[in-house]
């Protein structure tokens, strides 16, 4: 007899004994023995057979039963109903067959392998018993005392089913589920019985299947309404939909559909109460497409389905363009072209059902609050055409000039001290977000592509409430957008536009594919000519900013991008600031390792020359392959710079480069050169330095240097060398194959001597 030992190691056959020693050992060979017993198939399955003599090695008993066998208990799950097979096995089995509608096991259409596995599952998956006392070892053990079943698994298994694997359930969408339900309601008896094996053909319901209530209940109306929204070209009405899709609103279902993605015509506040009763939002007395406006004003949004994964544009959905091709054009034609502001609702008169004209100049004047029109003017032809086109659309009492397709707020957040941000719409209608590129100062940057195949960078910024820190970040983001919207320079990343939704703001920028200088000098050794070419372009972009009284305040290699032509572009204007006439600032902004002494000292003011100090640190970073003060932590750097100490300049650098860096890192602000002065330095012009360099400001070079920077960006490739004898351009500053091996390692000597840390360890 095979016994189950009460050992704590027992788990599904772990303590079964073998048939040779009668179960006294724990070799774990009981499971193969039982499998061989099942595979014999020497008996026919007979319901009337007496199974009481089934006491061979295949039977299972618990040692805690003291010789008396427990009543077996087996459980079968059939169509979410539980049926137990007890001691009266014969009658219970007949009842079980009657329940499932079969007369013999072969009618169950279960394959032979499934028959064995399901039999084992019934026998060996009984609930856990209470702790029992092992008779052999005399100690308590919490074993799984598997209760036996008297089902004879040695009996003849039924024939294999035509399908060896169960058919996966057919997943239906909303429209198919509704059609499937209607098929059940109006089902006709069929000639065949049972489920077909083909998943493409549905089985008919049984005759006793309960009929569905086809009355227009709330669920039925809402489901029908959602179906009409997706299938019919007719616009839905404001309020709950009737079963027939008419404009009659059902009060009991008002506001029960909170997940609709449709928007409807709305009116300004303090209007009739029926709009609140027919609101699509659950009992909150607010329309679903309401936008917070001054003086309780409401504005209608586009009824086009909006796709959050693409863009916030009203014409970005291809399905909506096919269903309503003229909607966006009508909305744009009826919108106010110069301003999207809505007049004060308190000063707005009671509007008639029909309007005489929708011209913007007539609506710009605010009439008296108590004035009433003497007669109803004729309705605008565009409103009539729109009503005829959409059939059941409720006639709105809003002037069509106030019905705009898309509301663009004049600024992201109202911060009093920040410049106003006018949203610039990108030149595309549909765009898709691609791979993650990196993280900027206030958001993550992704790659994007528009419907015409143009690639760009997308900075994604969350607009959720993040406390005081989040408000400050949004405020600085306003500065970045305001500054970038007015900047057009080949050495500054181009701003393409913005879009926003309820939670995020998307800033579209020019995509610069080769990454930042910080990532490039880790891959390549920047030689002298490369550093000189990049520095000249950085100076060109800085001069453009300084001429417009803009301080970048975060110049470093990580914020300078390079394209495939070797043109550098200043990026990440989150720290930039446009100063007043005095040009002085006191705010503590920037990265510690690149900060000027006057920026670190809170008692001192600084101006555009703070960017010159950061430029010197950036040139030193490109030359050495590491950040300035790379071996120090931020607080140590701030202490050193605050006391007037600059980063150490290696002695093995070229004289022109060392002199250029030392002049940029001048502690005294009055002795620090400007961009115009640095553009005449021998390190930039390529002339040999014969003695101490004395920089003299040359105003006449302002226009020339800017023109040269434009010529530089338009050069076809950086691999061509300059043939003229004048100051070389960026193309002439490029590295030729012969000059690569001149000083490949000289500018990286200091990195190994001082064991500087990588820029990733420096918090910007």
Swiss-Prot record:
Positions bound to ATP: 437-445, 459
Chaperone as UniProt keyword: no
Cross-referenced SUPFAM superfamilies: Protein kinase-like (PK-like)
Catalytic-site annotation from UniProt: 554
GO terms, molecular function: ATP binding; MAP kinase kinase kinase activity; protein serine kinase activity
Catalyzed reactions: L-seryl-[protein] + ATP = O-phospho-L-seryl-[protein] + ADP + H(+); L-threonyl-[protein] + ATP = O-phospho-L-threonyl-[protein] + ADP + H(+)
Start-end of Basic and acidic residues biased regions: 136-145
UniProt feature, compositional bias: Gly residues: 14-30
Disulfide bridge partners, by residue number: none
GO CC aspect terms: cytoplasm; plasma membrane
UniProt enzyme class: transferase
Enzyme Commission numbers on file: 2.7.11.25
Entries under Pfam families matching the protein: Pkinase (PF00069)
Compositionally biased tracts (Polar residues): 184-201, 752-764
Stored InterPro entries: Kinase-like_dom_sf, MAP_kinase_kinase_kinase, Prot_kinase_dom, Protein_kinase_ATP_BS, Ser/Thr_kinase_AS
Skewed-composition ranges (Low complexity): 60-76, 125-135, 715-729
Main location (coarse class): membrane
Region described as Disordered: spans on this chain: 1-81, 120-260, 325-348, 360-392, 706-764
Keyword annotations: ATP-binding, Cell membrane, Kinase, Membrane, Nucleotide-binding, Plant defense, Serine/threonine-protein kinase, Transferase
Subcellular location: Cell membrane
Function description: The CERK1, MEKK1a/b, MKK1a/b/c and MPK4a/b proteins are involved in pathogen defense. The pathway induces rapid growth inhibition, cell wall depositions and accumulation of defense-related transcripts. This protein is required for responses to chitin and acts redundantly with MEKK1a.
Family from the record: Belongs to the protein kinase superfamily. STE Ser/Thr protein kinase family. MAP kinase kinase kinase subfamily.
Protein name: Mitogen-activated protein kinase kinase kinase 1b
Source organism (scientific name): Physcomitrium patens (Spreading-leaved earth moss)
Lineage: Eukaryota, Viridiplantae, Streptophyta, Embryophyta, Bryophyta
């Amino acid at each position: 007899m095979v016994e189950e030992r009460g050992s704590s190691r027992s788990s599904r056959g772990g303590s079964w004994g073998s048939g040779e020693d009668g179960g006294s050992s724990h070799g774990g060979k009981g499971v193969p023995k039982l499998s061989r017993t099942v595979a014999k198939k020497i008996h026919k399955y007979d319901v009337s057979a007496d199974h009481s003599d089934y006491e061979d090695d295949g039977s299972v008993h618990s040692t805690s039963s003291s010789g008396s066998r427990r009543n077996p208990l087996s459980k079968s799950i059939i169509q979410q109903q539980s049926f137990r097979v007890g001691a009266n096995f014969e009658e219970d089995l007949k009842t079980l067959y009657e329940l499932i509608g079969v007369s013999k096991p072969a009618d169950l259409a279960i394959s032979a392998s499934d028959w064995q596995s399901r039999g084992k599952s019934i026998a060996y998956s009984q609930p856990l018993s209470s702790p029992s006392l092992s008779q052999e070892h005399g100690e308590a053990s919490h074993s799984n005392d598997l209760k036996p079943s008297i089902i004879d698994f040695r009996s003849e298994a039924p024939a294999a089913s035509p399908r060896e694997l169960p058919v996966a359930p057919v997943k239906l969408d909303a429209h198919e589920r509704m059609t499937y339900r209607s098929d059940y309601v109006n089902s006709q008896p069929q000639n065949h019985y049972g489920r077909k094996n083909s998943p493409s053909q549905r089985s008919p319901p049984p005759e006793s299947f309960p009929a569905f209530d086809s009355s227009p209940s709330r669920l039925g109306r809402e489901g029908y309404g959602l179906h009409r929204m997706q299938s019919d070209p007719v616009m839905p009405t404001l309020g709950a939909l009737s079963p027939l899709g008419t404009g009659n609103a059902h009060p009991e279902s008002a506001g029960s559909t909170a997940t609709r993605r449709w928007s409807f015509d709305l009116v300004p506040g303090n209007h009739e109460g029926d709009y609140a009763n027919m609101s699509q939002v659950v009992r909150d007395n607010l329309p679903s497409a309401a936008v917070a406006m001054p003086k309780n004003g409401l504005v209608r949004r586009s009824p086009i389905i909006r796709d959050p994964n693409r863009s916030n544009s009203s014409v970005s959905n291809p399905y909506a363009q096919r269903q309503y091709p003229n909607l966006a054009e009508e909305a744009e034609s009826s919108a106010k072209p110069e301003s999207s502001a809505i007049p004060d609702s308190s000063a707005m008169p009671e509007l008639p059902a029909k309007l005489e004209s929708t011209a913007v100049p007539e609506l710009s004047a605010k009439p008296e609050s108590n004035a009433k029109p003497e007669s109803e003017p004729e309705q605008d032809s565009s409103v009539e055409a729109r009503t005829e086109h959409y059939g059941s659309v409720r006639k709105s009492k809003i002037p069509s000039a106030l019905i705009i397709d898309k509301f663009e707020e004049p600024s992201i957040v109202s911060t009093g001290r920040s410049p106003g941000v006018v949203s610039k719409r990108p030149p595309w209608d549909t765009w898709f977000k691609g791979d993650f590129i990196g993280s900027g100062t206030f958001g993550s940057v992704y790659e994007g592509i528009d419907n015409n195949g143009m690639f760009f960078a997308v900075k994604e910024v969350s607009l959720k409430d993040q406390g005081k820190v989040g408000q400050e970040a949004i405020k600085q983001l306003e500065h970045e957008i305001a500054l970038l919207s007015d900047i057009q320079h080949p050495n500054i990343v181009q701003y393409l536009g913005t879009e926003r939704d309820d939670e995020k703001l998307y800033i579209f920028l020019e995509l610069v594919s080769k990454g930042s200088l910080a990532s490039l000098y880790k891959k390549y050794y920047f030689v002298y000519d490369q550093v000189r070419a990049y520095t000249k372009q950085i100076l060109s972009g800085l001069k453009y900013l300084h001429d417009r009284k803009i301080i970048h305040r975060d110049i470093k290699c990580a914020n300078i991008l390079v394209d495939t032509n070797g043109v550098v572009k200043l990026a990440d204007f989150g720290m930039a600031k446009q100063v007043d006439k005095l040009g002085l600032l006191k705010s503590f902004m920037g990265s510690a390792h690149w900060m000027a002494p006057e920026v670190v000292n809170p008692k001192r003011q600084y101006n555009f020359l703070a960017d010159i100090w950061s430029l010197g640190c950036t040139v030193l970073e490109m030359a050495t392959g590491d950040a300035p003060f790379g071996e120090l932590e931020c607080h140590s750097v701030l202490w050193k710079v605050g006391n007037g100490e600059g980063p150490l300049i290696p002695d093995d650098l070229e004289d022109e480069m060392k002199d250029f860096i030392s002049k940029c890192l001048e502690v005294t602000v009055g002795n620090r050169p400007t961009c115009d002065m640095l553009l005449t330095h021998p390190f930039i012009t390529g002339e040999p330095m014969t003695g101490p360099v004395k920089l003299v400001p040359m105003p006449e070079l302002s226009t020339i240097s800017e023109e040269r920077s434009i010529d530089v960006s338009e050069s076809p490739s950086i691999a061509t060398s300059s043939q003229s004898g004048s100051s070389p351009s960026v193309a002439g500053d490029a590295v030729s194959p012969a000059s690569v091996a001149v000083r490949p390692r000289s500018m990286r000597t200091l990195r190994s001597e001082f064991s500087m840390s990588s820029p990733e360890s420096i918090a910007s």
